[in-house]
Amino acid sequence: MTGALVVVDVQNGFCRPEGSVPRIGMGLAGAEAAVGNAAVAVRAAREAGTPVVFTRHLYRPGRADEGPNLYRGGELAGIDGLLAGTWDAEVVDDLGWTPADLTVDKCRFDAFLWTSLDPLLRGLGVDQLYVCGVVTNICVESTVRAAYMRDYRVTLLADACAAQTPRLHEAGVEVMGECGFATIASAADLGSALLGDRAVDVAAVPA
């Protein structure tokens, strides 16, 4: 099988205290740890030559693409949260993202819906996905379910994910694991699988 790492929405707007999502009262418990572990996974994948695909949840100016199901009744729109081209919408610096990276922008929870993610992965010959990111029980779970329904083998890197509360994170992980949508693992597990003994050295390198 050929694998790829899919990093879901690890953006300033979700993961930084001054981001738009925390500012409307939906901050993520354990975001800092999740970002750190996602960085470990990204470094391991890059070192192993495994494709890394980043997704970004964002909206165009004017937000015509946001649709009627607004975050918190429009609070996010009210502060221009996750607006394309802003700091809020960008991938956090810790992951070493650059414009040259494979990046899929989306405006719905499921990263496969109305995006180029599936043809991109098919074009890379990928049939195994390692998934991490935020929010565990929302965009990550929606994407994992969609991947499963498209016949990808999915591994969830649970310690590189975060949700609004630990309970919601744990519930999302439990559903994905117990329903068979994903095998549950950690960022360190990914490093070991891809790099063997070199995984420890990669994990120790600063982002």
What are these regions (language model features)?
Residues G19-A45, G49-P51:
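A short alpha/beta connector and helix-capping loop motif
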Residues G13-E18, G62-A64:
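Short acidic/His/Gly/Ser-rich catalytic and metal-binding motifs that mark active-site loops
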